[in-house]
Amino acid sequence: MSGQASPGAESRLLLVTGLSGAGKSTVLKVLEDLGWEVVDNLPLALLEALIDAPVKRGEAERPLAVGIDSRSRGFRPALLVRRIKELREGGGRDIQTLFLDCAGAELERRFSETRRRHPLAEDRPAADGIAREREMMEPLRRWAEHVVDTTNYSSNDLQQEVRQRFGEADDGEPVLNILSFGFARGLPRNADLVFDMRYLRNPHWDPALKPGTGLDPDVAAYVIADPAYEETVSQIERLILTLLPRYRAEGKSYVTIAFGCTGGRHRSVHVAARVAQTLRGSGYEPTLTHRNLDSAPQDGLEGKPPSAARASGGAR
């Protein structure tokens, strides 16, 4: 026996692509840590040869991640989409595409911070290359099964997102992430469910609580004391527990549930932590991410403070 095997019906291939500066290198490093075989900047002409190359029998089930972007030799998005279709139609391959997106202003900031030049604008402003690349990549973005917007992600946030999406889930359960965020700092682009916690009274306007977060006991107690808190949060928990088995039956591999308040530091943080604890008590294993927890409190983001009349009614 040769000790080699051709890729079988369970072979898994993930094409990792997207805008320059959006995080492809970070994604490939995490996938490698998760046990994937990783190849970056592969010329498009070699893609099929790589997929069909014999592998050792013990590694036949190892998933393969291939990084391809505008720097790759022979890169043409429309042609790549066509080749993916052909490879799928050939059977025996689970081929998916992950596209990393990011807002132009944030990409400009990243290129400026690292002092790197955009690959499509070596002698021009980065904004020119970003705009050109975005237009070029649009066919791939529309085609991709997985689109992750990294605009508001730190490196750690992106690493966690990749682990949630492409780590091994147990017993067919979807990978579950609970996220808190601030509406004033942008909606999360990848959430399946979004709950607005701004109806609860806001600890930001209490000088003693403003510097704290929803993880602090005194802030949590303030939020819990809202007359609407227990009834509404309990209803949200019941809804989520009803939906999760249905998501599993539908075959969803990951579910992100987001809780937002104005700044993302108080109400949403507390409620997200409570819901995550409730889900753990029901046998789930969610990860918990607080997107804006480390952001500085800003009065300008929180709107107008409650009126004196409202404060006298207990909504401080």
UniProtKB/Swiss-Prot annotation:
Keyword presence, Plastid: no
Molecular-function GO terms, alphabetical: ATP binding; GTP binding
Signal peptide bounds: none
One Pfam family, short name: RapZ-like_N
SUPFAM superfamilies (UniProt xref): P-loop containing nucleoside triphosphate hydrolases
Residues involved in ATP binding: G18, L19, S20, G21, A22, G23, K24, S25
Region: Disordered, residue numbers: 283-316
Organism superkingdom: Bacteria
Annotated GTP binding sites: D69, S70, R71, S72
Family: Belongs to the RapZ-like family.
Function: Displays ATPase and GTPase activities.
Annotated PANTHER family: RNASE ADAPTER PROTEIN RAPZ
Descriptive protein name: Nucleotide-binding protein Sala_2050
